[in-house]
Regions:
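Glycine-biased, small-residue-rich flexible motifs in mid-sequence functional cores and linkers
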Residues: 1-3, 79-202, 206
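Short, positively charged patches
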Residues: 1-135
Length: 209
């Protein structure tokens, strides 16, 4: 777990959408980047000025706080060097450096992952179709990936869960966020068959307990 704090530190410093493929080519181990001086970071030629500033400002203690919160709540921290980190994500130039997982992300390993997302205010027919398609995909052995919103996202998860399949809910909020409390029963079922997944965390993650 000790090396994961450097992955979290780098994720917090870069934020969403960064071209991490270039950064990891220059610094495959975030720990070495953390201890690199300003000259080493600058001459690597993979950081913007803003990123260089954030690397200096981001505190390692915030990453350590995230680790403590995850440990207390039983959440897993998955980074690209872990065996359970999804191979599909590694092909992305802006892949998330850290996955915060409530559940078991290994359930999607060796499965085809298919995303289903849509409006929060779908028609009745659209909801039924999303639920049916997700159920068919899950029954065929695919992992259904969707967000945590109401509407099509929830319908997709409901269909996959009802079919006894695997589904992963990618949450658009930080650790410990009480997001859409009415959807907690569905999230509980998702945890049992798949996982809730957060891609990023705020500098000071909230502890729901």
């Amino acid at each position: 777990m000790s090396d994961k704090k450097y992955w979290i530190w780098l994720s917090q410093a870069l934020g969403a959408g960064a071209r991490v493929d270039e950064i990891l080519s220059a610094f495959p181990e975030p720990e070495k980047l953390y201890f690199a001086d300003d000259a080493e970071r600058m001459t690597a030629g993979v950081f913007t000025r803003r990123q260089l500033e954030r690397l200096n400002k981001t505190k390692l203690s915030d990453a350590e706080t995230a680790i403590r919160v995850c440990a207390k709540n039983g959440w897993e921290i998955c980074v690209p060097t872990d065996g359970d980190y999804p191979e599909e994500l590694k092909r992305l130039a802006d892949m998330p450096l850290v996955l915060y997982v409530d559940g078991d992300i290994s359930r999607i390993k060796d499965k085809i992952s298919i995303g289903i997302v849509g409006t929060r205010q779908p028609s009745y027919d659209s909801t039924c179709i999303a639920r049916a398609v997700a159920g068919d995909l899950a029954s065929a052995g695919a992992a259904v990936i969707s967000g945590g919103a109401l509407g099509i996202d929830s319908a997709a998860h409901e269909g996959a869960v009802a079919a006894g399949g695997v589904t992963v809910c990618v949450m658009g909020c930080g650790l410990g966020c009480d997001y859409l409390r009415d959807n907690e029963p569905l999230r509980r079922r998702i945890r049992e068959t798949g996982a809730l997944c957060l891609l990023y965390t705020s500098p000071s993650p909230r502890d729901p307990k």
